[in-house]
């Protein structure tokens, strides 16, 4: 193996650039040529491919987003799209790839491996919804961004004795809301993985007010419902001064945290090691603070589970 490619796919996440940097520099250290593929699988099919060097990834580790850009390309699920990608890989002499993205990106990685190009997947998503990894690249930064916003919103909530419902990203996973809720001292956390009762929440808020706590912050995962709808349902059970806020794509941006930079560097380096061993169709993760790899096919039938012990802790520490 002499040449490998790197692409980022799906939603961007802080730390993707750190992962690209690690893959590129580790591969170059091992004597490999490295090619960057712009715009994910769409760029692969279009042949938007360029040779990288050490300076290409210089001054990138601290930057959010992805220097390789990203795009969704559902056509790659079809054989025709895959064959067009294979044609471009052959044209540039690329023999293996590292794909950085969410669960959808892993399907593309498996398809390319089946076509004879070993491909390793790295979990790049703020949602932390990938099975067989405790953390995904970008999750820690996203939580820190949310917590900073929660701290700021709590200031104004306290000033006006209001209850803020803060909706955060995460798709069908509640990890961002859960971790941010505990770190931000939220009065309640609503996630898809756990049932909730609006009437009981209203009752707890009222009891808290009677004890002198005149303001509150509630973290709501977007996979449950929209913040406005939740606030409307909550208002039906009590006389609360409610405000709803949506923390949208701001959570995906910004410089990656130190933890995400280190995690991305570890995963990127390990991905190259796996390729040098002739392995493909593997998904890299971190489990119990150890970098691991699993057959990517096992991820499709598995389901990520939120750390419900953390949910219990959140309940014990609120109201």
From Swiss-Prot:
GO terms for molecular function: 6-phosphofructokinase activity; AMP binding; ATP binding; fructose-6-phosphate binding; identical protein binding; metal ion binding; monosaccharide binding. One of its GO terms (biological process) is canonical glycolysis. The active site is at 127 (proton acceptor). Substrate binds at residues 125-127, 162, 169-171, 222, 243, 249-252. InterPro entries: ATP_PFK (IPR022953), ATP_PFK_prok-type (IPR012003), PFKA_ATP_prok (IPR012828), Phosphofructokinase_dom (IPR000023), PKF_sf (IPR035966). It comes from the Bacteria. ATP binds at residues 11, 72-73, 102-105. GO terms for cellular component: 6-phosphofructokinase complex. Mg(2+) binds at residue 103. Its main location: cytoplasm. Belongs to the phosphofructokinase type A (PFKA) family. ATP-dependent PFK group I subfamily. Prokaryotic clade 'B1' sub-subfamily. This is ATP-dependent 6-phosphofructokinase. The gene is pfkA.
């Amino acid at each position: 193996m002499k040449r490998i490619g790197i692409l980022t796919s799906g939603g961007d996440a802080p730390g993707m650039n750190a992962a690209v940097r690690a893959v590129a520099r580790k591969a170059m250290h091992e004597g490999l040529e490295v090619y960057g593929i712009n715009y994910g699988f769409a760029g692969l099919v279009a042949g938007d491919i360029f040779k990288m060097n050490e300076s290409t990834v210089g001054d990138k580790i601290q930057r959010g987003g992805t220097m390789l850009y990203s795009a969704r390309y559902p056509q790659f699920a079809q054989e025709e799209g895959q064959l067009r990608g294979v044609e471009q890989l052959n044209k540039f002499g690329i023999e293996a790839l590292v794909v950085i993205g969410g669960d959808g990106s892993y399907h593309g990685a498996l398809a390319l491996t089946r076509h004879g190009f070993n491909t390793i997947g790295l979990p790049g998503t703020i949602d932390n919804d990938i099975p067989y990894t405790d953390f995904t690249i970008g999750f820690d930064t996203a939580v820190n961004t949310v917590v900073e916003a929660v701290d700021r919103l709590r200031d104004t909530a306290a000033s006006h004795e209001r209850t803020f419902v803060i909706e955060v990203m995460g798709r069908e996973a509640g990890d961002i809301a859960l971790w941010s809720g505990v770190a931000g001292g939220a009065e309640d956390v609503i996630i898809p993985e756990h049932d909730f009762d609006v009437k009981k929440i209203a009752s707890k808020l009222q009891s808290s007010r009677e004890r002198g706590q005149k303001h509150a912050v509630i973290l709501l995962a977007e996979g449950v419902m929209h913040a406005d709808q939740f606030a409307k349902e909550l208002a039906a059970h009590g006389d609360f001064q409610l405000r709803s806020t949506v923390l949208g794509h701001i959570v995906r941006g910004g410089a990656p945290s130190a933890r995400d930079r280190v995690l991305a560097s570890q995963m990127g380096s390990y991905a190259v090691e796996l390729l040098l061993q002739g392995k493909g169709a593997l998904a890299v993760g971190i489990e119990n603070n150890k970098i691991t790899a699993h057959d990517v096919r096992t991820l499709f039938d598995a389901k990520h589970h939120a750390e419900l012990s953390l949910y219990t802790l959140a309940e014990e520490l609120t109201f």
